[in-house]
């Protein structure tokens, strides 16, 4: 019988932070895990083309392994407001890459981009059921300023409206020169 000895490999993988392109949209579904957000991704990309949002990706060998989206304008001024507040949302990193600092880098890149655009505050939401996200944001200097019912809806890939109820904390952070 052959004896197998466990071996470990250390990989150095290059990750590029960049804005999404049209060709990234199908890949954002992560092999079916997020297919239900297909229409959301398409609409968000169109909003980015019109200067209302940003879609920042962590790219590994031409595949998005992480993302954060930024809303630059909103009717709800406490979340996003022209040249004052930008709202970071949909922060996501593939499970096998979590704990490597990619989420932190995505948030920092979003902060740097909106600061360069003249924004002085960023806001982000942490689901009350996700204490790890809240701790991450607080470590990065975010402070809770409100609670939100977290009620929203989206149209899935089959054209069916899905309603979401995800109570959350709203956190904010001063960025750039004020």
What annotation goes with each model-predicted range?
Residues 1-11:
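Short acidic N-proximal helix/loop "leader" segments that mark the beginning
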Residues 90, 94-108, 117, 128-135, ...:
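Conserved glycine-rich acetyl-CoA-binding loop
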Residues 120, 127-130, 138-178:
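C-terminal "cap" of GNAT-fold acetyltransferases
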